[in-house]
């Protein structure tokens, strides 16, 4: 959804760098396929995911971040105790650079347990990025 239906080969790192700063290996995005979904439907889902992090949404606390965020809260039923809470987000919503997923076992609602953790991670990621560009 975040990449307009395009599915890329996942990488945990973008490049490997030697101690001297030279690049050993650079990983480029590799398109693996795409979803058979119309752009109209993708736009609808993306809009709904952005609304989750706006006023009135279940993760509206993320609206205070310096970038727009799209996300989805969730609760997974647990027959052995309190439900598990989860939240997934990508940011910036218009041109995603990061995806963060958090599940809190027995955390109840994702909006209460997992979303604040994701917010903290995104604050860190974008604060560090702003330092790098002198903002």
Predicted features and spans:
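Active-site beta-strand/loop architecture of penicillin-binding DD-peptidases
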Residues: 1-32, 49-134
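Extended C-terminal subregions enriched in glycine
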Residues: 36-50
């Amino acid at each position: 959804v975040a990449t307009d239906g395009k599915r890329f080969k996942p990488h945990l790192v973008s490049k490997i760098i030697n101690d001297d700063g030279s690049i050993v290996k650079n990983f480029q995005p590799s398109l693996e396929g795409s979803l058979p979904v119309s752009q109209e439907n993708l736009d609808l889902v993306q809009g709904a995911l952005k609304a989750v992090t706006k006023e009135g949404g279940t993760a509206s606390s993320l609206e205070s971040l310096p970038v727009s965020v799209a996300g989805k809260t969730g609760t997974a039923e647990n027959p052995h105790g309190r439900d598990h809470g989860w939240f997934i987000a990508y940011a910036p919503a218009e041109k995603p650079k990061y995806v963060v997923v958090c599940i809190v076992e027995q955390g109840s609602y994702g909006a209460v347990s997992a979303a604040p953790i994701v917010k903290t991670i995104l604050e860190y990621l974008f604060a560090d990025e702003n330092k790098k560009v002198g903002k």
